[in-house]
């Protein structure tokens, strides 16, 4: 997960942010109960911050559009915004200590028939175990 700011947001031009910079900022977030939201809300609480959630959606594209066109911030998976990053419409910030990194596991029943599609998925997951951050990624410091 990374913090993201659209090209029209004041943070877009910054290379380094501090957690205190997030205080009072407007955010577009996933719905209540989302693991992404829970992880970020814990970070906000740990840092003693207060943010404003002005958008709430269960669709990543809706959240991304809010970031692009409404000067809000969000915390999202890097994998959801390659196109926008490549075309310099978004600036991303990664926490220094990588505390927002997540691990996913493929779980299946050992006695069930596995389809070729599942084997392909497993092969893809092993092929891309980690995602590289773009070189222009900003830093989020505490």
Question: Which residues make up each language-model segment?
Answer:
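Hydrophobic hinge/microswitch elements
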Residues: 33-93
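Ligand-binding clefts/hinges and TM-proximal coupling segments of bilobed small-molecule sensing domains
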Residues: 33-39, 43, 47-49, 119, ...
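Short secondary-structure boundary/capping segments
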Residues: 1, 18-20, 45-46, 82, ...
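A late-sequence structural motif
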Residues: 91-135
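Flexible hinge/capping segments at coil-to-helix
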Residues: 1-27, 31-32, 116
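Residues embedded in well-ordered beta-strands
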Residues: 2-4, 10, 73, 91, ...
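Short secondary-structure boundary segments
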Residues: 7, 78-80, 97, 104
